[in-house]
Amino acid sequence: MRKWRIEDSEELYNITGWGTSYFGINDKGHVVVTPRRDGVAVDLKELVDELQLRDVAAPTLVRFPDILDNRIEKMSSCFKQAAEEYGYKAENFIIYPIKVNQMRPVVEEIISHGKKFNLGLEAGSKPELHAVIAVNTDSDSLIVCNGYKDESYIELALLAQKMGKRIFLVVEKMNELKLIAKMAKQLNVQPNIGIRIKLASSGSGKWEESGGDASKFGLTSSELLEALDFMESKGLKDCLKLIHFHIGSQVTKIRRIKTALREASQFYVQLHAMGFKVEFVDIGGGLGVDYDGTRSSNSEGSVNYSIQEYVNDSISTLVDVSDKNGIPHPNIITESGRALTAHHSVLIFEVLETATLPEWDDEEVIAPDAHELVQELYGIWDSLNQNKMLEAWHDAQQIREEALDLFSHGIVDLKTRAQIERLYWSITREINQIAEGLKHAPDEFRGLSKLLADKYFCNFSLFQSLPDSWAIDQIFPIMPIQRLDEKPDRSATLQDITCDSDGKIANFISTRNVAHYLPVHSLKKTEPYYVAVFLVGAYQEILGDMHNLFGDTNAVHVSVNEKGYNIEQIIDGETVAEVLDYVQYNPKKLVRTLETWVTKSVKEGKISLEEGKEFLSNYRSGLYGYTYLEH
């Protein structure tokens, strides 16, 4: 058998599929990140080792700002190419909805690099608007205001507009339009009004119900006519600058996008025919990320189109309908936050230990006085072959069930139960090995690989770092960052360190279908083993929660140039004291309470003075230490 090659690992984990030229494997068998075409590749294993020297322990979230920059440039260049091809005569505006990742360093990097690309921000709530107005200092870039609004929200936006911000208030419900009219009159400002339209078209994938008739937001055709009459009656006809639609996040099928664009373009035409000179069409989000690298519409974690195809369809549809009706091309706004941010963040954590189902030692023989069920099961294991495997499987299951029932009634002892378990799982393993080599294996054996997978316990919280994996079964690319020049010899599910049975990852990307285990390597006592989760830059940080009081992980920002990489910033993860403070425990008060208790225990002779000091020292140290396990 030939030696395992790096190309085999590339195929196994499909890194060339989902990696989008950013991720690969080097000659050392390490995962590398190439944020820029003119920059170096960052070896993730070497980066983790350097961070360890700097006392930055895993789990660590690694952000690559250069990837953010590249994503902005990619989207902008796609629009430029499409504009030239289809004779588009208006402007495109890339808008970043900060709900996707509101972390200040992320937003500031997007704003900084996006200035020359007409990049603006979208706020979907009052707190987000407060952030957006302050950080978006470029007076030429757009600010789009979505979400539910009250008077203070609208007043803030209108006053910011009065001072020079290009702010658009998008009406989600009819009562908002009335509030905008009222506040605009009080403040003596001509508002830039947008209207979100509820299309009949919907997206595809997990967020299909975000669009269509079941959509939470938007005005129906009847409500739109009511809104138009209201604006005309209030002298606000010229204030309607924008129409907006959104058919859902992560749209998997380009056909759904095309259908929505055709429907939305007719609203643009009809409004112009009614004398409403709309200038902007905001096509919302929906531009998907190919998480599994299969370019397939059948997978919720993939998409069957490229950014260029998405942009081509957007521009060509609106150009075509505008030219046919003799109206100006609209300025096109896109809100593709997921596509901008997903690739730039990588979560890295260490595998702490493993758990494997018991197995029978090949050299072990059973004692003559062993229980008859043990002897019978041993005989099945000893004579197992392909011809008898289905019958053997049925017999093994029956014997195991009988043994467990006898144990529950106190008839067989613990030693016998343990022997039954070891033999049963050894039989199961051998049957699975035979079945995997068959072209047509019995259906009963399909779930055995999942059942037999090891458990790799990892130093992270699924709920804090990968909430979508738990909440909506989102599948992210996951693989070891080292030893990729070696053939993986184990199959495992990943278990986090929360005290919750849901804290696990048991679905992984596969070129054939979803896999229920991850190919990994046996652990070495002398070498830490790291696993990385990729494409986690969208939504995961901001949606994460503190289940079991695990806080934010350490985060580092890594930039690259022609000579190498630089660790630009290290953001310490949350301490135990910080997360306790979130849930209204005063750390200082906790220490004082413990000091009183320890003093009392010393006086009562329960512990010595030195033991009391040691306990308090450990408590204080732990209180201001990392919430994750430390070596």
Language-model segment annotations:
Residues 66-74, 226, 263, 313:
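A non-catalytic, amphipathic alpha-helix used as a structural packing/dimerization or gating element
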Residues 7-9, 73-81, 104-109, 129-130, ...:
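Short alpha-helical segments and helix-capping/turn motifs at coil-helix boundaries
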Residues 20, 25-102:
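Low-complexity, highly charged intrinsically disordered N-terminal segments
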Residues 58, 62, 84-89, 274-278, ...:
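Flexible, glycine/charged-enriched surface loops at secondary-structure junctions
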Residues 1-31:
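Charged, compositionally biased N-terminal leader segments and the immediate start
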Residues 305, 313-315, 319-631:
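Charged (often Lys/Glu-rich) extended helix/loop segments that serve as interaction or gating elements
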Residues 87-280, 287-293, 304-309, 317, ...:
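Active-site-proximal beta-alpha core segment in soluble small-molecule metabolic enzymes
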Residues 30, 38, 67, 101-103, ...:
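Short, glycine-/Ser/Thr-/acidic-enriched flexible segments
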